[in-house]
């Protein structure tokens, strides 16, 4: 979906990697949460504390999923799922955006 309705949005951004990755938390009436983020070109490693679905909103990412050795490409409109308590890497050569839904 390209529009989120009836939500509350955190004014303060979540800033990572010296400002190269930034996101905002979005809270829904049912108690669920998503983050909307922008990633500058680079390579980054993230860890999860709960399950996540990462949807690519614009651009593309190469992703090294947990327990794999091959980078996989995800472009606009695609998504990948992550378990809780894992680490994964992403890299991109141009600005890209994502929406993270928490499971």
Swiss-Prot record:
Swiss-Prot/TrEMBL keywords: Glycosyltransferase, Transferase
GO molecular function: guanosine phosphorylase activity; purine-nucleoside phosphorylase activity; thymidine phosphorylase activity; uridine phosphorylase activity
Signal sequence interval, chain numbering: none
One GO CC term, this protein: cytosol
Alphabetized Pfam families for the sequence: Ppnp (PF06865)
Listed EC numbers: 2.4.2.1, 2.4.2.2
Highest taxon listed in the record's lineage: Bacteria
Listed InterPro entries: Ppnp, RmlC-like_jellyroll, RmlC_Cupin_sf
Gene3D superfamilies: Jelly Rolls
Enzyme class: transferase
Keyword Transferase tagged: yes
CDD domains on file: cupin_PpnP-like (cd20296)
Catalyses which reaction(s): a purine D-ribonucleoside + phosphate = a purine nucleobase + alpha-D-ribose 1-phosphate; adenosine + phosphate = alpha-D-ribose 1-phosphate + adenine; cytidine + phosphate = cytosine + alpha-D-ribose 1-phosphate; guanosine + phosphate = alpha-D-ribose 1-phosphate + guanine
Role this protein plays: Catalyzes the phosphorolysis of diverse nucleosides, yielding D-ribose 1-phosphate and the respective free bases. Can use uridine, adenosine, guanosine, cytidine, thymidine, inosine and xanthosine as substrates. Also catalyzes the reverse reactions.
HAMAP family the UniProt entry points to: Nucleos_phosphorylase_PpnP
Family: Belongs to the nucleoside phosphorylase PpnP family.
PANTHER family for this protein: PYRIMIDINE/PURINE NUCLEOSIDE PHOSPHORYLASE, PYRIMIDINE_PURINE NUCLEOSIDE PHOSPHORYLASE
Protein name in UniProt: Pyrimidine/purine nucleoside phosphorylase
Organism the protein comes from: Shewanella baltica (strain OS195)
Taxon lineage: Bacteria, Pseudomonadati, Pseudomonadota, Gammaproteobacteria, Alteromonadales
Gene from which this protein is expressed: ppnP
């Amino acid at each position: 979906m390209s529009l989120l309705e009836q939500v509350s949005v955190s004014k303060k951004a979540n800033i990572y990697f010296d400002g190269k990755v930034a996101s905002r938390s979005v809270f829904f009436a049912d108690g669920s949460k998503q983050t909307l983020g922008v990633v500058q070109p680079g390579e980054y490693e993230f860890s999860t504390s709960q399950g996540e679905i990462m949807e690519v909103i614009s651009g593309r990412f190469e992703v090294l999923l947990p327990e794999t050795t091959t980078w996989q490409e995800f472009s606009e409109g695609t998504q990948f799922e992550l378990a809780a308590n894992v680490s994964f890497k992403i890299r991109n050569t141009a600005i890209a955006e994502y929406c993270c839904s928490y499971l």
